[in-house]
Amino acid sequence: MAIEPRSLGIEEFIQKRDQESMSTATDTPLSRIKPEKIDQAVIRFAGDSGDGMQITGSQFTNTVALYGNDIATFPDFPAEIRAPAGTLPGVSGYQLHFASADVFTPGDSVDVLIAMNPAALKVNIADLKANGILIVNSDSFGENDLRKAQMTVNPLEDHSLDKYRLFSVELERLTRAALEHLGLDAKSMDRCKNFFALGMCYWLQSLDGVHGSVDFGQVQE
């Protein structure tokens, strides 16, 4: 799924990038995927207040804007101050509506939902369109996580999400695997899982996220 850029310069850049990628790509199932071109999309990042959903949404917004798309955003902060982790009152979200034409609202229903835990899924799932893309962090769906979200069964196993395109991703395990060479402790690596999810969304939308995120977190010289 890719948004068509508005700027001719951006189109030329993307064509050049794709040509360079094709020259080195191997013939894999991923390399044979043909993205569906659409003119707009609404995406929502949702998780605990400490999961970095606001910065993740902001970075995604910056990149989308660099590609020449019109945007409207809706940051959603919980009313509670530091609600217990994993609970319904502590869910934070960031919604972005971006398009190749003018955008006037952040959107009502969403095309893509990224849920970092069961509470985020429960609070936001009603807004996801049928056949919408649902990405969940399966590492956070343990018994204790489900109990905090007031769930009695695991929604990833009871077919209640069958009307969506569900991608159950081990975000914590994959993030740790990607960062294991840096010598970070487990807690520090787990704090980066929001940017792993951000990278997945860049790929999903055929965006080169490097331009919007490469300087984030670097100390200014």
Regions found by a protein language model. Give the residues of each.
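Active-site cofactor/cluster-binding pocket
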Residues: 2-221
